[in-house]
């Protein structure tokens, strides 16, 4: 059910009960008092029409399963409003005799009692709906807070994991640097070893040549 529609309905029920009482009291009044009371009634009827239009607009924005039941209520409210308008016309016509006035007064009193009971029932239903809505809002708020706490915990865990990844990245970067340095050292050592091989080879060749020269001179003497 729409909370907005419920609010308009509650206002209309209160206004309807007030109009019923004013119509009943206007029957027994004369002169300026009657004019003042009729002015109040007409102002109330205008407010009632505004509320009905608002309820109609709100009902038509709702899903079909809700809209149908609310439109039935609206027809009842419109019929109730038309009855008030008819009664106001009869009161303002000035053609009521004493018997008719008494009859209308008694009918108005009966309608007031019936309307008051009906309004009380509707107000109680509206209050119960508001109570249930409040409970749902509290449950939703509690769920939202729990979800927020879980979200904060997840964010904290993600932050911790991010820090761990950053430290691991720094460690890997350091390892890469060490590997690069080690590779450079090995390259230098390999280059030196190759250089030493050539040097040793040259020395060996020189020694062999010297031996051959010595042997040659000894054999030729």
Curated annotation (Swiss-Prot):
Localization per record: Golgi apparatus, trans-Golgi network membrane; Prevacuolar compartment membrane; Vacuole membrane
Keyword field contains Secreted: no
Tissues where the protein occurs: Expressed in roots, stems, flowers and leaves.
Residues on Cytoplasmic side: 2-198
BP GO annotations: gravitropism; intracellular transport of virus; lytic vacuole organization; protein targeting to vacuole; vesicle fusion
Pfam families linked: V-SNARE, V-SNARE_C
UniProt keyword annotation of Membrane present: yes
Membrane-topology descriptor: Single-pass type IV membrane protein
Topological domain spans for side Vesicular: 220-221
Positions of post-translational N-acetylserine modification: 2
Disrupted gene: phenotype observed: Abnormal amyloplast sedimentation and gravitropism in both inflorescence stems and hypocotyls with elongated stems in a zigzag fashion, due to narrower angles in internodes mediated by aberrant cell shapes. Reduced formation of vacuolar membrane 'bulbs'. Altered transport of proteins to the lytic vacuole. Small and wrinkled rosette leaves. Fragmentation and vesiculation of vacuoles mostly in cortex cells of the inflorescence stem in comparison to endodermal cells.
Domain of life: Eukaryota
UniProt KW keywords: Acetylation, Coiled coil, Golgi apparatus, Membrane, Protein transport, Transmembrane, Transmembrane helix, Transport, Vacuole
InterPro entries according to UniProt: GOSR2/Membrin/Bos1, SNARE, v-SNARE_N_sf, Vesicle_trsprt_v-SNARE_N
GO cellular component: host cell; late endosome; plant-type vacuole; plastid; trans-Golgi network; vacuolar membrane; vacuole
Coiled-coil intervals, chain numbering: 32-93
Membrane-spanning intervals of the chain: 199-219
GO molecular-function term, one example from the UniProt record: SNAP receptor activity
Free-text function comment from the UniProt entry: Functions as a v-SNARE responsible for targeting AtELP-containing vesicles from the trans-Golgi network (TGN) to the prevacuolar compartment (PVC) and mediates liposome fusion. May be also involved in retrograde traffic to the cis-Golgi. Promotes the formation of vacuolar membrane 'bulbs'. Necessary to deliver proteins to the lytic vacuole, but seems not involved in storage proteins transport. Required for amyloplast sedimentation in the endodermis during shoot gravitropism, which are thus acting as statoliths.
Family from the record: Belongs to the VTI1 family.
Subunit structure: Forms SNARE complexes with the t-SNAREs SYP51 and either SYP21 or SYP22 in the PVC, and with a much lower affinity with SYP61 in the TGN. Does not interact with SYP41, SYP42 or VPS45. Binds to EPSIN1. Interacts with SCYL2B.
The protein's name: Vesicle transport v-SNARE 11
Gene name for this UniProt entry: VTI11
């Amino acid at each position: 059910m729409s909370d907005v529609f419920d609010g308009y309905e509650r206002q209309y029920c209160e206004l309807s009960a007030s109009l019923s009482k004013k119509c009943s009291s206007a029957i027994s009044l004369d002169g300026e008092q009657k004019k003042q009371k009729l002015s109040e009634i007409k102002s109330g009827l205008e407010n009632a029409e505004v509320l009905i239009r608002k309820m109609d607009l709100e009902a038509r924005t709702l899903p079909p399963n809700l809209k149908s039941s609310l439109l039935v209520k609206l027809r009842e409210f419109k019929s109730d409003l038309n009855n008030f308008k008819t009664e106001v016309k009869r009161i303002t016509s000035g053609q009521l005799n004493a018997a008719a006035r008494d009859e209308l007064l008694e009918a108005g009193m009966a309608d007031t009692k019936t309307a008051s009971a009906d309004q009380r029932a509707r107000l109680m239903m509206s209050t119960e709906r508001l109570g249930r809505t409040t409970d749902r809002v509290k449950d939703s708020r509690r769920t939202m807070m729990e979800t927020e706490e879980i979200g904060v915990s997840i964010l904290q865990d993600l932050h911790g994991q991010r820090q761990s990844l950053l430290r691991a990245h720094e460690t890997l970067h350091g390892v890469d640097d060490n590997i690069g340095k080690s590779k450079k050292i090995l390259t230098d050592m390999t280059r030196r070893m190759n250089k030493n091989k050539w040097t040793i080879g040259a020395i060996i060749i020189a020694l062999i040549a010297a031996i051959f020269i010595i042997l040659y001179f000894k054999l030729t003497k």
